[in-house]
């Protein structure tokens, strides 16, 4: 899980979602998981 000031999609399967007021990237590849904060 990466914590970045700006989250971006890395591959085609990455999805940007809002969960509990935080922007997240979820993906099949665990290395692509990100959260904005």
Swiss-Prot record:
Q: Which family does it belong to?
A: Belongs to the bacterial ribosomal protein bL36 family.
Q: Which Pfam families match?
A: Ribosomal_L36 (PF00444)
Please name the source species: Clavibacter michiganensis subsp. michiganensis (strain NCPPB 382)
Q: Which UniProt keywords apply?
A: Ribonucleoprotein, Ribosomal protein
One GO BP on record is: translation
Q: Which GO terms describe its molecular function?
A: structural constituent of ribosome
Q: Which PANTHER family match?
A: 50S RIBOSOMAL PROTEIN L36, CHLOROPLASTIC, LARGE RIBOSOMAL SUBUNIT PROTEIN BL36C
Q: Does the keyword Ribonucleoprotein apply?
A: yes
Name of the protein in its database record? Large ribosomal subunit protein bL36A
**What's in the GO CC field?**
cytoplasm; ribonucleoprotein complex; ribosome
């Amino acid at each position: 899980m990466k914590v970045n000031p700006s989250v971006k999609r890395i591959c085609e399967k990455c999805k940007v979602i809002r969960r509990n007021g935080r922007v997240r990237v979820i993906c099949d590849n665990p290395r692509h998981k990100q959260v904005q904060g």
